[in-house]
Amino acid sequence: ANNPGARKAIRKIEARTEVN
């Protein structure tokens, strides 16, 4: 998904995984 919104969501999920 090259959509900016989807990328933002993926980045947010990645950040959450990093905190995990």
Curated annotation (Swiss-Prot):
GO terms for molecular function: rRNA binding. Keywords: Ribonucleoprotein, Ribosomal protein, RNA-binding, rRNA-binding. GO terms for cellular component: ribonucleoprotein complex; ribosome. Residues 11-20 have a biased composition (Basic and acidic residues). Residues 1-20 are annotated as: Disordered. Belongs to the bacterial ribosomal protein bS20 family. Binds directly to 16S ribosomal RNA. This is Small ribosomal subunit protein bS20. It comes from Brevundimonas vesicularis (Pseudomonas vesicularis). The lineage of its organism: Bacteria, Pseudomonadati, Pseudomonadota, Alphaproteobacteria, Caulobacterales. The gene is rpsT.
